[in-house]
Amino acid sequence: MARMVFSRSFIADLAAFDKPTRDAVREKMTLVSEFPGVGTRALGDFSAYSFGQDALKVAVSGLDVFYRREGEPGPDETVYVLGVVPQRCIR
C-alpha cells in the first residue's frame, strides 16, 4: 500500500462538499493507494496546466481527483493527491 500525501488545496476544496461525497472520495483514494493501475492520465490543457503532465485522475461522484505517483509500487511508493475539481468545470 502506497503512502498518501494530501495537498492543502485538496483538503480545502474537499471540505466544500457534503459528507457522502467526501466519504466516496476517501474510499476511491484508498483504492488508488492499494492498486497502482487505478486511474487514467489527466488529459487536457486545464489538467496539464493545473496539475502537471504526469498527473493521473479518478472520477468519483461527479468530481475528478488529480494525483501523482512516485516510486516503485508497494510500500516505497508515494501518492500525492493534488486536487479535486467538479467535472462540469473541466469540460
Tell me what each language-model feature is:
Residues 1, 12-15, 23, 55-91:
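Enriched for short, Lys/Arg-rich terminal
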Residues 1-4, 29:
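Detector for methionine-enriched segments
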Residues 5, 17-20:
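Residue-level signal for short amphipathic helical patches enriched in basic/charged
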Residues 14, 18, 29:
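Short amphipathic alpha-helical/adjacent loop interface patches that line ligand
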Residues 19-22, 34-38, 63:
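Generic structural signal for secondary-structure transition and capping sites
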Residues 26-36, 73, 78:
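A short beta-strand-loop micro-motif that forms or neighbors metal/cofactor-
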Residues 31-59:
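A short, surface-exposed loop/turn module that caps and links secondary-structure elements
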